[in-house]
Amino acid sequence: MPAYMFVSSKIHDPVRFAQYRKEMQVFAPKHGGKYLARGEILEVLEGKFDTDCHVLIAEYPSVDIIKNMWNSKEYEEIKKLREGAGDVNIFIIEGEDKILKI
């Protein structure tokens, strides 16, 4: 079942964060990850959300793959590149095998 990683980041050190992003663009696909959307928030339709954030939505084959990737020694090294570069919130949700009816 697909899983999705959502990331919001308020970047304080663009140069350092760019190094992290560059590494992740190579690392994530090795684990079946593909970026679905990335950019600045265009508009908050309801509620409160920091619009100074950058947002990323990535799809992976499963929650287990995300967790294994996250806990890998390779990611541990990559993650050091973004330490101190910004405030980051990351969460995952499990997708659906079939289209949901609304």
Question: Whereabouts are the PLM-identified features?
Answer:
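Short S/T/G/P-rich N-terminal loop/turn motif that feeds into the first structured element of a domain
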Residues: 1-71, 95-102
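C-terminal structural segments of small proteins and small subunits
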Residues: 67-69, 74-91
